[in-house]
């Protein structure tokens, strides 16, 4: 599935035309994860569908979801913009940016510098760079370019080997451990426990995917996560605000 997604993304980039610059203000994704509302930060994801689960929220309303997250004191938002596989849109991100005060992560498969400029123009405050998708050198180059454009970067890894290759080149400020294997789609929060000791102490560690319960949250926090990225378990509920409260045991 990952290979299909990347192949489709490469095709898309061939004909990608940059949108007009929305001249959005920049908000610090990193600062929001340092100064969190709770003892562990929350990046709440606006997500309609996924290739492994299909439609997650049939009554999808991106702006209402984002407002519910903001009301529930999510520290940052993550917005899916990949259309073919996740039914996301750039327009969702821009719309949310206009109405919500939280920093926004653009959740997509960034493989080319044109997508970084696109991210800036549509209002993203941060982008995702995936270690299992990019060669370490290419990831580093895209990281530097994003920084130069005023964006924060969440560098995501699944495997220890991937993280080690990246750390041999440079140390990202924010490292995300994807608890989901992108090849098999198997998910376990044990992955955060396994990878956390390899993450430099001055990095922010984000645990991503598979966090469904207060116990999951407690587990990844205990093993060093500064923040969690949660999408599906929140999006499946009729009220995202209540879902966040339940997740945090409130």
UniProtKB/Swiss-Prot annotation:
Keyword Metal-binding: no
Pathways involved: Amino-acid biosynthesis; L-tryptophan biosynthesis; L-tryptophan from chorismate: step 4/5
Alphabetized UniProt keyword annotations: Amino-acid biosynthesis, Aromatic amino acid biosynthesis, Decarboxylase, Lyase, Tryptophan biosynthesis
EC numbers: 4.1.1.48
The keyword Nucleotide-binding is assigned to this record: no
Top-level EC class: lyase
Family: Belongs to the TrpC family.
Protein name in the entry: Indole-3-glycerol phosphate synthase
GO terms of biological process kind: L-tryptophan biosynthetic process
Record field: catalytic activity: 1-(2-carboxyphenylamino)-1-deoxy-D-ribulose 5-phosphate + H(+) = (1S,2R)-1-C-(indol-3-yl)glycerol 3-phosphate + CO2 + H2O
């Amino acid at each position: 599935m990952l290979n299909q997604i990347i192949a489709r993304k490469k095709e898309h980039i061939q004909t990608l035309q940059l949108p007009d610059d929305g001249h959005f203000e920049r908000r610090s994704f990193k600062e929001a994860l340092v100064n969190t509302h709770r003892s562990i930060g929350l990046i709440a994801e606006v997500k309609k569908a996924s290739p492994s689960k299909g439609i997650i929220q049939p009554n999808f309303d991106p702006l209402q979801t984002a407002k519910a997250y903001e009301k529930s004191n999510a520290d940052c938002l993550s917005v899916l913009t990949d259309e073919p596989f996740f039914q996301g849109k750039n327009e969702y991100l821009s719309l949310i940016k206009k109405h919500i005060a939280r920093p926004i992560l653009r959740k997509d498969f960034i493989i080319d510098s044109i997508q970084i400029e696109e991210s800036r123009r549509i209002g993203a405050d941060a982008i995702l760079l995936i270690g299992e998708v990019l060669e370490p050198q290419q990831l580093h180059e895209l990281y530097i370019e994003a920084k130069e454009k005023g964006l924060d970067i969440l560098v995501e890894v699944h495997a220890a080997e991937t993280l080690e290759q990246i750390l041999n080149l440079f140390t990202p400020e924010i490292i995300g451990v994807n608890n989901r294997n992108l090849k098999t789609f198997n998910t376990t929060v044990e992955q955060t426990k396994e990878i956390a000791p390899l993450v430099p102490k001055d990095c922010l560690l984000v645990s991503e995917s598979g966090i469904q319960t207060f116990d999951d949250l407690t587990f990844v926090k205990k093993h060093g996560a500064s923040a969690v990225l949660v999408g599906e378990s929140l999006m499946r509920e009729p009220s995202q605000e209540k879902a966040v409260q339940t997740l945090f045991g409130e």
